[in-house]
Regions:
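Anion-binding alpha/beta catalytic cores of soluble intermediary-metabolism enzymes, centered on
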Residues: 1-161
Length: 161
């Protein structure tokens, strides 16, 4: 069974701070709700819950606390393996029912690297990137986009209106 994920941010924000990460998370959640019917968010980190510390972990914890109090269905900080695998998440102290479908990366570097590795090594089909936060949907296609990529991106851009 195919699994769909929203990865964010993979293309735009070079210097992420707490406010930008919060906006990225909200926009990605809105896109997931429109395209996938639900949004369950992982705020990704090298740390799960309290297992590590540092500036990026502190930023993720603050975004988590703000958005959790606003009613978002999210988990974080959480490592990638725990975001994908419920059994690993449980061993690390995180419990979720449905699968997580929105992956929020702590930096453009992490997001872009993960997106390209999934596409190349994991044979994931990637569509986009979609630029969020604009009045109208915007898709930024790679110079290596195929005809199928262009058609799929166009269909999803229209669906997100």
């Amino acid at each position: 069974m195919p699994r769909e994920y929203i990865f964010s941010d993979c293309a735009v924000n070079i210097n992420v701070n707490e406010e930008i990460l919060k906006d990225i998370t909200v926009s990605a959640s809105e896109m997931a709700n429109k395209l996938l019917g639900f949004s369950k968010i992982a705020l990704l980190s090298f740390s799960t819950l309290e297992s590590g510390d540092g500036e990026s972990v502190k930023m993720i914890r603050n975004v988590y606390n703000t958005l959790k109090s606003d009613g978002f269905d999210l988990y974080g900080p959480i490592q990638g393996d725990a975001a994908i695998n419920k059994e690993i998440a449980q061993r690390k102290g995180i419990h979720y029912d449905d699968r997580i479908n929105v992956m929020i990366f702590p930096s453009l570097d992490a997001g872009n690297i993960a997106y390209k590795l999934c596409q190349s090594l994991g044979k994931f089909r990637s569509i986009g990137p979609f630029l969020q936060g604009f009045k109208k949907p915007v898709c930024d296609l790679s110079r290596g986009a195929t005809t199928e990529d262009i058609i799929s991106s166009s269909v999803l851009t229209i669906a997100s209106i």
